[in-house]
Amino acid sequence: MAWLGIGMGRQIVPVLVFVAVLCSGVDASFNRYSFPKDFIFGTGSAAYQYEGAAKEGGKILNGDTGDVADDFYHRYKEDVNLLKDMNMDAFRFSISWSRILPNGTLSGGVNKEGVAFYNNLINEIIAKGMKPFVTIFHWDTPQALESKYGGFLSENIIKDYVDFAEVCFREFGDRVKFWATFNEPWTYCSQGYGTGIHALGRCSPYVSTSCAGGDSSREPYLAAHHVILAHATAVHLYRTKYQPTQHGQIGITAVSHWFVPYNDTAADRRVVQRSLDFMYGWFLDPIVHGDYPGTMRGWLGARLPAFTAEQAAAVRGSYDFIGVNYYTTYYAKSVPLPSSNRLSYDTDIRANTTGFRNGKPIGPQEFTPIFFNYPPGLRELLLYTKRRYNNPIIYVTENGIAEGNNKSLPITEALKDGHRIEFHSKHLQFVNHAIKNGVNVKGYFTWTFMDCFEWGDGYLDRFGLIYIDRLNNLKRYHKQSSYWIANFLKRKKY
């Protein structure tokens, strides 16, 4: 039905909002005015998942790649209009390192066309009354640097990353006021170098025979160490050279599950803390406190790189805000010590995490089966961040739910996503609870703006507020959730 398409969106907002609210059972009185006046609402994306114009072949489900993705590179003006239609305050996106520095290094030259694309995008976002939130690195290390010295396994990456970051600060920082150095380094390091299920696909042979080499007991920690040092060096550069005149903020985006003890025992309570330390504290403890969590140091010993006194001083306090990505909560249960000759990041945690206890899920299991819909977990993670990390400024930079890419489903049915409306409404209510309990949360970004390339799952998952028809020239359609959020964010006219 053509009237459900993007072009006619404004004409049917009231009807579909009414239908969506009725279907979801959400509280219509809960809206943007339930939050502090300066609270920022937005949605997010990532360069490789959206832009297209990538050339590397895929080695993931269905053989999918990001070569075309959502073709955001050519359609960004149309897409920024969609953001405006949803009354968003901000748009979160990442900058492709290779699009700016094709050879990965400053000496290899700056791609002026890449710089022009991001300048045009930033200008368009601002022209529509929104704020750009920019991630400098979202998992797309230039292949040239992987081939040259092994990417983040080498300390050489620090200088090249900071050179890339400086190009971004210099070219875009007069308009960009929110920078995140890295997105989810936990995912990049643990799954790229520990399990091999994400790029770069490295792991020990006893973890997976499909990995292209690696050491799951050491490489995740080495790569993470270089990420943290690169982050701190870039923050220092920004603070000393650009922040005094550009007046922006800089931080990092971490991801964490929330964890609940499987049994009410001291052992399982300890494993909850250990799980948080190995996932969340791995990055935030150094950045806030100057060193890795004691649980990591005590177990890993020499496998965990050490900060020099000078490095620790540089890393400590290297943030203006913390971005928090949250998707699920698990039960955590203690397990026996792992075999000393089959160590890996996963076995180092010494935990069994599951969404089920006595056959019952902790929350409804989602289409993405590793995720369980448990909104209180977001509140608990925010409260924990307040307690452990000195009540920092926080932006919830990702939170979302998917449905499957059912090609046999008529588009008119595929646009009915009441589950997403309920998901965001309930999670926002728990964010609101956290704020009322003193957590310094300043914003909330849905994942994601449009259905996109979801890394290892390719195009099987649809997380977007906007439906992408991959069988019809990537045509955009509003899902019901996009109308709901437009209504939720609608400003009063005085």
UniProtKB/Swiss-Prot annotation:
Taxonomic superkingdom: Eukaryota
EC number(s) reported in the record: 3.2.1.21
InterPro entries named in the record: Glyco_hydro_1, Glyco_hydro_1_AS, Glyco_hydro_1_N_CS, Glycoside_hydrolase_SF
Catalytic residues identified in the record: 184 (proton donor), 398 (nucleophile)
Disulfide cysteine pairs (residue numbers): 203-211
Binding site for a beta-D-glucoside: 49, 138, 183-184, 327, 398, 447, 454-455, 463
Record GO terms (molecular function): beta-D-fucosidase activity; beta-galactosidase activity; beta-glucosidase activity
Gene Ontology BP annotations: carbohydrate metabolic process
Keyword Signal: yes
Catalysed conversion reaction: Hydrolysis of terminal, non-reducing beta-D-glucosyl residues with release of beta-D-glucose
Signal sequence region: 1-28
Keywords: Disulfide bond, Glycoprotein, Glycosidase, Hydrolase, Signal
Similarity-based family: Belongs to the glycosyl hydrolase 1 family.
Name of protein: Beta-glucosidase 29
Species the sequence originates in: Oryza sativa subsp. japonica
Gene responsible for this protein: BGLU29
